[in-house]
């Protein structure tokens, strides 16, 4: 994997810097590195593809070295270099696609394609110029079963989940109380509602709670907490739990009271925040517990009082909500990230070449299913294909 990264880094630099008119002295170190790459690769044959509709291609390396010059690089020099660069880039692209198309239930972090396994041989270690990539560093650690640490912004840690629970219901569905939520990606939105606005609740207060368990622990997370859940702030018709009917939800938004968010790790509370909104920090957690209250306003103007009558029918439904959004965090496991294209790159290659469903990944690389059942085998394979996708993205946009 380190060799693949070094090849890509060298080729990217060569493509960007070996241009007509450039002083040779400005790129002499790069050209020496480029020539070392050619010397190492010459005389070797590789084969890629042969899975799904990814065609089999054979690769033979027999290229001349780039020479020295006292002055600027001329058109002939650059044209010779370009021919070599484009062949190498095409080779790297196909190695990456071949690797992204394969999976294994055992030791899925190791190279799976014939070409990448060959590049892992001792003879190619001379190409290992640079492994400063975060993905390469963590792939090395994972390969040795040591602790990794990926920094994610907008991590896709929450499987998609949208539902409701009713703490009070009846066949007519005209006096309900409960919670509804939407968890997806890096965001949780949860709302507590009471059609009667806590009319008969103790002290006119309804208590709500929402607990979310993560599939992998996060550390040093920067989080935004807001006293609102905008996705539940407009009227809607909702299917009943048994699917036999529908019920009407017409929210009137109140501010939540006694808001508390707890971050837990293995059942132990690590951080707690009470009535604090905006940016908060969570040190280490695998579970989030949100609790908040809906309080019937003790004093109301006539207009507000008309919204929350003392008896049915309740045409407006008192609602309070919270939004919790993970802005950035560190995770020991590789995740999809809304700010990165790695999952999209891997999925696109597998779809384009009709890669058959294997023993590890779900059909279509369905992220919700993948993260919901995030097994060690999936983690290993995802670590590998994301590392390869990060390498490919240097050369292929």
UniProtKB/Swiss-Prot annotation:
Q: Which residues form the signal peptide?
A: none
Q: Where does Zn(2+) bind?
A: 153
> What are the TM regions of this chain, as residue ranges?
none
| Localization (cell) | Virion
Name the Gene3D superfamilies on file: 2.60.120.170, Viral capsid alpha domain
Q: Quick one: a GO biological-process term for this protein?
A: fusion of virus membrane with host plasma membrane
Q: Which residues bind Ca(2+)?
A: 266, 286
Q: Which family does it belong to?
A: Belongs to the rotavirus VP6 family.
Record's miscellaneous remark: The VP6 trimer contains a zinc ion located at the center of the molecule. The zinc ion is not essential for either trimerization or transcription activity of the DLP. Zinc-depleted VP6 has an increased sensitivity to proteases.
- Primary role: Intermediate capsid protein that self assembles to form an icosahedral capsid with a T=13 symmetry, which consists of 230 trimers of VP6, with channels at each of its five-fold vertices. This capsid constitutes the middle concentric layer of the viral mature particle. The innermost VP2 capsid and the intermediate VP6 capsid remain intact following cell entry to protect the dsRNA from degradation and to prevent unfavorable antiviral responses in the host cell during all the replication cycle of the virus.
Q: What protein am I looking at? A: Intermediate capsid protein VP6
Give the originating organism: Rotavirus A (strain RVA/Human/United States/P/1974/G3P1A[8]) (RV-A)
Taxonomic placement = Viruses, Riboviria, Orthornavirae, Duplornaviricota, Resentoviricetes
